[in-house]
Amino acid sequence: MTIDCHEDRRVLLVPHTGRPQNVASAALAAELLDDSGVGVRVLVPAEDTTVATHPVLGQFERVSHSPQATQSVDLVLVLGGDGTFLRAADLAHGADLPVLGINLGHVGFLAEWEKDSLDEAVRRVTKGSFRIEERMTLDVSVYDSNGTAIGRGWALNEVSIENSNRSGVLDATLEIDSRPVSSFGCDGIIVSTPTGSTAYAFSAGGPVLWPELDAILVVPNNAHALFTKPLVVSPRSSVAVESHPSAFPATAVMDGFRSISVPPGARVEVKRGSRSIKWVRLDDIPFTDRLVTKLRLPVEGWRGPKNMIPQINPHSA
């Protein structure tokens, strides 16, 4: 995969500017791209003056979070944590652009490499030395009690159906492939992709799914019932959550920042997304190694198969 070789190649740089060291990393990335003849456009919140006044970043085009931000862009480069990546993915998904994450945060499960390898990552981008991995998404539709569509959205990680005020119990019925599974009270129901299985669904007791697996994960969150185990269903399945007519108003929250109101008696339908995310990969390190590294899992004493050559990734923390 390469960035299209036209004269006005351009990368949308999406930095988390909350820390001085992050701004310095963004400036470095912008300079490296510019020196390689790649145009730079910087995404910044409207209230953020850090970029505009920065001696390096202030020289580049600045845009806000809108569909226009990705016009004439070839790739989205994210510098930050998982939250920054998910917001950048919102733009990349709408424009069908590849997205690359460099972790400047703590865990950074969605990032490809760590900040210490930023210069090499940018070099790979400018040379086209990367491949694209298609990551599954979810399409979300909300219908009122009369069956009228009242909202649609999508998620890369998960959609969480939960009480709007988070102070009561969500009374709901879970449905798989147009058949009822169970009715119960809970804090919420999480429907996740394999990519999102290490996020909110994992914290709620769900299993980790390897990202190359095609499946949909359903995790009841703090449910008050006997049968509330996580479910792994076919990627072709439809998952629905019906709110009880006398229930409190609820909300379908997608990736933690996009939301749709779910009134009493409403229905939330979740299916495999019609468009995947184009995930930039810079190496072939197994997901198992990423999992161990990110979660700092203890593996002392492991010897491994005979004659196995260990894989070492110098670009991951």
Curated annotation (Swiss-Prot):
It comes from Corynebacterium diphtheriae (strain ATCC 700971 / NCTC 13129 / Biotype gravis). The active site is at residue 82. This is NAD kinase. GO terms for cellular component: cytoplasm. InterPro entries: ATP-NAD_kinase_N, ATP-NAD_kinase_PpnK-typ_C, NAD/diacylglycerol_kinase_sf, NADK. NCBIfam families: PRK03372.1. Its EC number is 2.7.1.23. Involved in the regulation of the intracellular balance of NAD and NADP, and is a key enzyme in the biosynthesis of NADP. Catalyzes specifically the phosphorylation on 2'-hydroxyl of the adenosine moiety of NAD to yield NADP. Gene3D superfamilies: Probable inorganic polyphosphate/atp-NAD kinase, domain 1 (3.40.50.10330), Probable inorganic polyphosphate/atp-NAD kinase, domain 2 (2.60.200.30). NAD(+) binds at residues 82-83, 87, 157-158, 187, 198-203.
